[in-house]
Amino acid sequence: MARTKPTPPPLPHALIPLPAHTLPILRTGPQAVAYHIPTSPSSPSNPILKTTIALPLHSTWTSGLHFHTRHTEYLRLVQGAVHVHLDGEDKILSASTGGEIDLRTGALKAEGLVVKVPAYARHEWRRAEAWYAGRRSVGAKMTRPEDVGDEVVVEEYTDPSDLEKPLFFWNLNGIITATEDGELSVLQRVVRFVLGGWWIPFQLLVVFWELDNWPVFWDLRGIMRQFLGLKPWVYRHFGWRLEYAMTFVVLFAAKILGWWTGVRAVEQRRTPDKLWEAYKRHGI
């Protein structure tokens, strides 16, 4: 019996040329990703702050299921093919095809490579390749787009176009990629010891609360439909309220603990100078 070749590891790299007014952060591993994050506030020459995310072949990175309360978000596909889950609906967008494709035939279903995500809409996106891999056992025949194996490049931006998105990505990645903690107070060292492996997730929750990124911890829409067999109206009337309540309670608890211990969502050591100066002057 022939052996299946192991899947090569995804290799992230910075885009060449770099998107204007950005610097890259690379994260390796199975969820390899390259973030190109704005380093300065908006200006007449750069009115919309765009974070460009590149996902190499075989990356299993996902944005995670989440929502925003203060912003409308836009996802613009530049290259490759992505799966977008938006308020219970699954979409595959292909840059080479020019828009959303039919999941069964692969034909163009709707032109356009920009996905609008309204405030409070639950959404998640990833490489289409990763989504198809998870659907193999379902049995439904699906036609994949030609560019499913290409590197994925997506621009994220918001309306209003303020500092929150770049501050979020700089501080999120600053926490995740830090090789060691910055200078900690005695209280922070005690909390870090007590939390153990939850120290980093706790800091991320503080960032989520402050910078308008609300994770959905339990996908009750899927649980109610697939495992409990409940009708869709149950989620429409009750499920989403439970999801939002759980998210609020968890993040609020983290915010209170962060306030008590002095753990902040935005810190100077994780933030480029021009963004930090704008944040100190005007807030988010």
Label each residue range with its predicted role.
Residues A2-T72, R76-V78, H83-I284:
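Jelly-roll (double-stranded beta-helix
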